[in-house]
Each structure stands twice: as C-alpha cells, then as structure tokens.
Design a protein with these regions (language model features):
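Short alpha-helical catalytic segment bearing the HExxH-like zincin motif
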Residues: 64-72
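Active-site scaffold of zinc-dependent metalloenzymes
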Residues: 1-64, 76-80, 87-91, 100, ...
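Long, well-structured alpha-helical subdomains associated
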Residues: 109-117
Length: 117
C-alpha cells in the first residue's frame, strides 16, 4: 500500500525474514555500502527513507504487526516532519511527537488493515 507523509510517497511491503535478509544484501550491494549484518538478527519492521519503503515481517501475528507498523510510521513521521538527524528527545518532546502524529499514523494503519484494528 502507498501512503504519503508530508507529501513524500512511501510504500508498505510485507516480507518474510528470508526475503528481507536477501533484499538487504542486494540493496547494500546496489548502494555500494558495507553489507548489513542481517544474518544474525530478526527484524519485525524496517524503514528505508531514501527508497520510500516500509518493510514489515509478513509472518507476525496481527497485533504485533499493527504495533510494528505504528513504530515504523513513527520513524517516517520524525524523518519527514521533524529531522533526519540523530537526536535525543526529552519526555515532553516524545509526548508532543506522539500527540501530533497520532491521527496521521493511525489513519494509515486503519487504511492498511482495512479498519480491522
């Protein structure tokens, strides 16, 4: 599913652990960067801002998949509305981010799961 975050288009893709790990190696080779150490890790979700893709493990139970999507969409929100730099956030800033992003993120999640939240 495609969605926009501050007029930047992203797509949500569900992949298995194996598919994601194979894709990461290919992407790293294409981008000319050091190959990611994905062999030993387990991913639930990952956001690739430069490619505009949010990956979610397709084998997660519905409740965990939903939480993971919210988590990844929060990364998108922070990147597109706040900053692309590493930053330490105070509790007050986190509360503001959560409150300000809630409707945007939950609308995308609702659309993705067809209202089955």
């Amino acid at each position: 599913m495609k969605f926009k975050m501050n007029d930047i288009t992203y797509v949500i893709k569900e992949l298995s652990q194996k598919e994601y790990k194979e894709l990461r190696v290919i992407e790293d080779e294409e981008d000319g960067v050091e190959i990611s150490d994905v062999k030993n890790g387990i991913y639930q979700g990952s956001t690739h801002h430069t490619k505009g893709i949010v990956y979610i493990d397709k084998n997660l139970p519905h409740e965990i998949k939903r939480k993971t999507l919210i988590h990844e969409l929060t990364h998108c929100y922070i990147r597109e509305y706040i900053t692309h730099e590493e930053k330490n956030y105070s509790e007050e800033m986190v509360a503001d981010i959560s409150a300000n992003s809630h409707d945007i993120i939950h609308k995308i999640v609702e659309d993705y799961f067809g209202g089955d939240n």
